[in-house]
C-alpha cells in the first residue's frame, strides 16, 4: 500500500469522528474508468435503480446500487488498488469484505435534498467496523457538499430510518430502536463538518455517521458520486423490522452468520 494515501492523523480522525476527507488519492485513470462505468450504468440500470425526479422538469437524480458484477470498473476498483487498501487502513484491519457500491448522480437543478440519515439501519448487516468511501467524479463545492455530524454518543444510536421523499418513519415503533432526531436539531449541531471535494478526493464515513447533502437547485454542474462500502470480517447478516436497502435476499445466510458468500468478496493487505 502507498502509505501516503492515509496518514496517521487521518486514521485517528476517522476513528474519533466517524468521517475524514482524503485528498488526491485517486489518479486520472481510475476516475476515467469509473466515469465510463457510471455512464454505462445510467444507460443500463440495475433492478433497484431509482429516478427521484423522473416525472418533473427539474434535473435528473439517478441512483443505483449492487452492480459491481456487471461493470468491470466498479469491481476492479472496489476489490483491488487504492480503495480497498484505504478501507482497510481506516478500519484498522488486515482483511475485510466489500459490501456494495452505490451510484448517485444529481444533475443541475435538482431540488431533492438528501436528508440527515445514517446508513446502518437501512442495511441488512451488522458491523461495528465499517466505512463508506464517497468518491466524487465532479468538483463538489461547499454549496452542494456532503455534510456529516461527528460520531458522538448522542447520535451513535439505533435509529428508525426515514423515507427520503417525505421524511416519514419506516415504522412507528421498533424494539431496540429510537425515533430519528428532528432535522432542525441536527441542523443546529455544533459538530457538523462539510466536505467540499475534487475528483481524486475521497470522503470516508462510518455506517453510523449521520450525513446529508443539499439539493443542486442553484448549481449548474453535475454531481456524480460513487460510494464504495466495506465492513470488517466479523460483520454478520442481520434482519431489520423493515425492508432493507439494498433488498438483498438471505439465500443461505441466517441472522448472525458471517458474510462468507460470494456477494461479499474478501479484501486483504
Describe each PLM feature range.
Residues 141-210:
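Double-stranded beta-helix
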Amino acid at each position: 500500500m502507498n502509505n501516503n494515501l492515509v496518514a496517521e492523523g487521518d486514521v485517528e480522525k476517522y476513528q474519533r469522528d466517524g468521517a475524514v476527507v482524503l485528498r488526491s488519492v485517486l489518479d486520472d485513470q481510475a476516475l476515467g474508468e469509473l466515469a465510463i462505468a457510471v455512464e454505462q450504468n445510467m444507460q443500463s440500470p440495475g433492478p433497484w435503480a431509482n429516478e427521484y425526479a423522473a416525472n418533473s422538469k427539474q434535473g435528473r437524480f439517478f441512483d443505483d446500487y449492487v452492480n459491481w458484477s456487471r461493470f468491470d470498473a466498479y469491481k476492479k476498483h472496489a476489490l483491488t488498488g487504492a480503495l480497498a487498501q484505504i478501507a482497510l487502513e481506516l478500519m484498522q484491519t488486515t482483511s475485510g469484505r466489500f459490501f456494495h457500491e452505490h451510484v448517485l448522480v444529481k444533475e443541475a437543478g435538482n431540488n431533492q435534498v438528501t436528508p440527515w440519515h445514517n446508513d446502518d439501519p437501512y442495511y441488512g448487516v451488522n458491523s461495528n467496523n465499517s466505512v463508506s468511501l464517497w468518491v466524487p467524479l465532479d468538483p463538489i463545492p461547499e454549496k452542494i457538499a456532503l455534510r456529516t455530524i461527528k460520531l458522538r454518543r448522542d447520535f451513535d444510536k439505533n435509529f428508525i430510518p426515514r423515507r427520503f421523499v417525505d421524511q416519514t418513519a419506516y415504522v412507528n415503533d421498533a424494539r431496540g430502536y429510537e425515533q430519528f432526531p428532528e432535522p432542525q436539531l441536527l441542523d443546529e449541531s455544533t459538530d457538523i463538518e462539510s466536505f467540499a471535494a475534487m475528483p481524486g478526493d475521497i470522503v470516508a464515513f462510518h455506517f453510523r455517521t449521520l450525513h446529508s447533502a443539499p439539493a443542486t437547485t442553484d448549481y449548474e454542474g453535475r454531481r456524480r458520486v460513487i460510494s464504495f462500502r466495506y465492513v470488517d470480517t466479523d460483520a454478520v447478516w442481520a434482519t431489520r423490522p423493515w425492508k432493507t436497502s439494498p433488498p438483498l435476499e438471505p439465500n443461505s445466510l441466517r441472522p448472525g452468520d458471517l458474510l462468507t458468500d460470494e456477494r461479499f468478496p474478501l479484501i486483504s493487505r
